[in-house]
Amino acid sequence: MVGALFILGEGVLKKPVEIIVTTDYSSMIEAMRFGRIEVGYFGPFSYVLAKSKAPEIEPFGVGVEKGKPNYQSILIATADGPVKEIADIKGKPFAFGDRASTSSHLAPRAHLAKKGLIGDADYKVVHLGQHDAVARAVAAGQVPAGALSEAIYRVLVETKKVDPAKLRQLALSEPIPNYPMTVQGFLKPELKDAIKRAFLELKDPTILKLFRVEAIAAATDRDYDVLRDMAKVLNLDIAKL
């Protein structure tokens, strides 16, 4: 992806590009909030959090994968462990990733809430930070169940970083809108429009492959209301997160 951003920035926009890789979602939100980043590629829920703190941020693009601008979380359990179905999670630890992650926290936690399982009341919430850490911990039996991005899970299986024989698939979450591409609202209109066009009109399969998408479709803030609804299910006050 870094290479793709350089190509777009310096090749298409004719502008020098500085790539900033933040350590986690929270630091990226703060960098965007205080204007240290002009273009940001957020996780869906981290975008919602960022938008609540910096309303001027504008989503404009979303990656399309397998013909869809969305993805899902997968809830998994240790194959030979005590969790055979969702109901078995009650009274046990459950692993999530980053607190601001959509597919390894918000979506699966909302999914469990809709099944009558409330975090830290019906099961112990464990945060492991990264998607792959969740998969590895569950496969090793360190925690009996957990959740991560279904797409990342498939990559971990395909690259043999986790053994699917050691895992049981419990459920998939409802569809989640893909990661939004965002731009600072304070940029000059002509630059902002040029950035949006550079992404939305992108057809080069080589560059798209670097983004790990088939195409980039237009996105609006309203597309992410589903995340705000999930937060309501969990009684989360987005403004205070």
Label each PLM-derived region with a short phrase.
Residues V83-P93, V233-L241:
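Immediate post-signal peptide segment of exported/extracytoplasmic ligand-binding proteins
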Residues M1-A4, I176-N178, T182-L241:
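An extracytoplasmic/periplasmic, membrane-proximal ligand-sensing/linker region
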Residues M1-S46:
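Extracytoplasmic small-molecule ligand-binding "clamshell" domains
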